[in-house]
């Protein structure tokens, strides 16, 4: 008997096709107003545009709108499973602005990224995945010893709409970070300019790799 992971099947059959449909047919091209909101988002997290000049930012689940372009002068590495489809079907796709693009899921380990990232960003992504713990485990490997992890995601308890295969809570996310070797520096609900990315409540953690003695 073949036993399949129902969460993975939902992600593969519904979530990814839904994401592709949204980005190709319904997502508006980024404009000045969206870039203003994106700046407000990162500044609300405590970052400025020049913080990572000459450093490496890894964007997990980057989508078609490359939020991490916010970091001027940084090397941007995008990890996006639908990258090839976005680049082929969306004329304005901002993945073209990334220095490197891996058309892979966040769950897949990319050995070339081990120990390279000064900052890993994962925004409005984890609730759309099939194995969040594997992603967090990979992020811990990708970070330099003094690197940071910015994780921000909507909590909404919705797993039956096809687009959100996993249910996340503030407790489960905090436990996941701690179990995968992180120390949490900041954690809070809501965003600086709105309650969530889409629905529910946004939860954000900023963390670093656990150091000896922590």
Task: Give the predicted meaning of each segment.
Residues 180-182, 186-214:
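Core SAM-dependent methyltransferase catalytic element
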Residues 48, 108-115:
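Short amphipathic alpha-helix with an adjacent loop that forms part of the alpha/beta core around
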Residues 150-174:
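Conserved class I S-adenosyl-L-methionine
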Residues 121:
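A conserved beta-strand element that flanks and buttresses the S-adenosyl-L-methionine
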Residues 58-109:
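Class I SAM-dependent methyltransferase SAM/SAH-binding core
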Residues 124-125:
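Short catalytic micro-motifs in class I SAM-dependent methyltransferases
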Residues 133-148:
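A short glycine-rich, Lys/Arg-flanked "PGG" loop and its adjoining helix->strand segment in the class I
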Residues 1-51:
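Class I SAM-dependent methyltransferase Rossmann-like catalytic core
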């Amino acid at each position: 008997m073949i036993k399949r992971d129902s969460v993975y099947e939902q992600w593969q059959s519904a979530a990814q096709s839904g994401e592709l449909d949204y980005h190709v047919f319904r997502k508006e091209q980024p404009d000045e107003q969206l870039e203003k909101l994106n700046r407000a988002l990162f500044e609300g997290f405590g970052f400025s545009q020049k913080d990572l000049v000459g450093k490496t930012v890894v964007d997990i689940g980057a989508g078609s709108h490359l939020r991490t372009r916010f970091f001027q002068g940084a090397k941007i590495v995008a990890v996006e499973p639908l990258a090839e489809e976005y680049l082929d079907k969306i004329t304005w796709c901002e993945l073209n602005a990334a220095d490197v693009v891996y058309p892979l899921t966040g769950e897949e380990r990319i050995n070339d990224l081990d120990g390279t990232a000064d900052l890993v960003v994962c925004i409005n992504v984890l609730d759309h995945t099939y194995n969040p713990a594997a992603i967090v485990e990979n992020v811990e490997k990708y970070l330099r010893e003094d690197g940071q992890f910015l994780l921000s995601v909507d909590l909404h308890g919705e797993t039956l709409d096809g687009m959100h295969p996993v249910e996340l809570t503030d407790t489960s996310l905090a436990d996941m970070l701690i179990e995968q070797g992180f120390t949490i520096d900041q954690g809070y609900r809501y965003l600086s300019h709105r309650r969530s990315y889409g629905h529910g409540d946004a939860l954000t953690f900023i963390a670093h790799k656990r150091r000896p003695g922590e």
